[in-house]
Every structure is written in structure tokens, then in C-alpha cells.
């Protein structure tokens, strides 16, 4: 019959700190390992894990030949009125929408590019 991890953890949780320290020392000797991890190596590991970006910004760089289609996309995406959307499009390069998720940003960029505009996600 083998001992499960849960049984081992339950047994360790009932031990005193002094006995746990002795157990760790015995494990280190038995398997020729060290439990000493320097703070610098832990920080290095954490620094290597890149943070995934969750908020994106879509920027309109150039209108292209189909200005009316771009204005329609801006109106439907931002909820702005016709005049505000037109002014926004004519002020390119400009930010269209900020703090949106990746899927929405990709969709908006694709729609703008399909309509002849130049757009980017930042």
C-alpha cells in the first residue's frame, strides 16, 4: 500500500516546526538538494514572466479613400453622433477607442482596414 500526498501533508501539518525543519534537512541530505533559494533568483523568475496586456487602444492613422464607411464604423463603435464621428475621422491620426479588450480591438481594426483606413492597436 502506498502513501498518498494528502496523507503526507496531513502528517506534516501535525508536526512541530522543529520536527518539520529536521524533516527538511533529512530530505536535503537524502536527495542531495538545497532548499535555499536566494531572493535574487526569485525576482529574476518573476521578471521573466511577461504581464499580459488586457486593455488596448485603437488608433486611426489615415482615412483612406472611403471616408463615409469609416465614419459609419466610428459611429457604430463609439456611439458618437454623425458630426462628432466625422470630426474624429477628419482629425486622423487619432485615437478611436481606448481600454477595450483584445478581441474588440482586433475586430475594430479589421473593420477599419477592410474599409480602406490605416489603423493600429497599441
Swiss-Prot record:
Pfam family, one: Ribosomal_L12
One Gene Ontology term of the molecular function aspect: structural constituent of ribosome
Residue ranges of coiled coil: none
GO cellular component term of the entry, any: cytosolic large ribosomal subunit
Keywords linked to the UniProt accession: Ribonucleoprotein, Ribosomal protein
GO biological process, one term: translation
Keyword Ribosomal protein included in the entry's annotation: yes
Gene3D superfamilies attached to this UniProt entry: 3.30.1390.10, Single helix bin
Subunit structure: Homodimer. Part of the ribosomal stalk of the 50S ribosomal subunit. Forms a multimeric L10(L12)X complex, where L10 forms an elongated spine to which 2 to 4 L12 dimers bind in a sequential fashion. Binds GTP-bound translation factors.
NCBIfam families, per database record: L12 (TIGR00855)
Function (record text): Forms part of the ribosomal stalk which helps the ribosome interact with GTP-bound translation factors. Is thus essential for accurate translation.
Family: Belongs to the bacterial ribosomal protein bL12 family.
Protein's name in the database: Large ribosomal subunit protein bL12
Gene source species: Buchnera aphidicola subsp. Cinara cedri (strain Cc)
Amino acid at each position: 500500500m502506498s502513501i498518498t500526498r494528502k496523507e503526507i501533508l496531513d502528517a506534516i501539518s501535525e508536526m512541530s516546526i522543529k520536527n518539520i525543519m529536521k524533516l527538511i534537512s533529512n530530505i536535503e541530505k537524502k536527495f542531495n538538494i538545497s532548499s535555499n533559494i536566494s531572493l535574487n533568483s526569485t525576482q529574476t523568475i518573476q521578471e521573466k514572466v511577461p504581464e499580459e496586456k488586457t486593455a488596448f487602444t485603437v488608433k486611426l492613422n489615415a482615412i483612406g479613400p472611403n471616408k463615409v464607411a469609416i465614419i459609419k464604423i466610428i459611429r457604430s463603435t463609439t456611439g458618437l453622433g454623425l458630426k462628432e464621428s466625422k470630426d474624429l475621422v477628419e482629425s486622423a491620426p487619432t485615437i478611436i477607442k481606448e481600454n477595450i479588450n483584445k478581441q474588440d480591438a482586433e475586430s475594430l481594426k479589421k473593420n477599419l482596414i477592410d474599409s480602406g483606413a490605416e489603423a493600429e492597436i497599441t
